[in-house]
Amino acid sequence: MIPSRPLPASPCTMAKKASQPLNQRRAPAVPPSAPSRDLQVFPNPAPERDYVIRFDVPEFTCLCPLTGQPDFAHFTIEIVADKLCVETKSLKQYFWSYRNEGAFHEKVTNSIVSDLVAAIQPRFVRLHADWFVRGGIRTFVTAEHCKKGWKPAPKIELPGAQ
């Protein structure tokens, strides 16, 4: 007869003993993200220079105001900042705030540009919205704002550059 000995503890058994009951777990140090229309800003680190900040937002969602069905869009935002830049996490939360809101494509696109202008007063902002196919029709909406008196520098084409 083989003498019995206790089985070694498995990683699963050890994890169960080490974990705390759900009602005794500590709250996270940073609260989880939540939708918000509050666009946070920070000082432009190079206000003396015109440069383009490009945001690619491939998963924007809102609701169709007529059917309540979700509408999806891919946004490309180009900004030439002046004194302020928009902080990306707050921009993510801002977009998230539209998730359960009903609005027409044109209204959403223009509202976002207006909110960005109000928050950072950029030299230039353009939002190109590629709304996914709905009823067999794909919609593209582009809205832009140019600060009065601002003139972009001429584009430089370099030989061999793509």
Regions found by a protein language model. Give the residues of each.
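N-terminal amphipathic/basic-hydrophobic helices that include classical n-h-c signal peptides
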Residues: 1-13
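N-terminal intrinsically disordered, cationic/polar leader segments
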Residues: 12-162
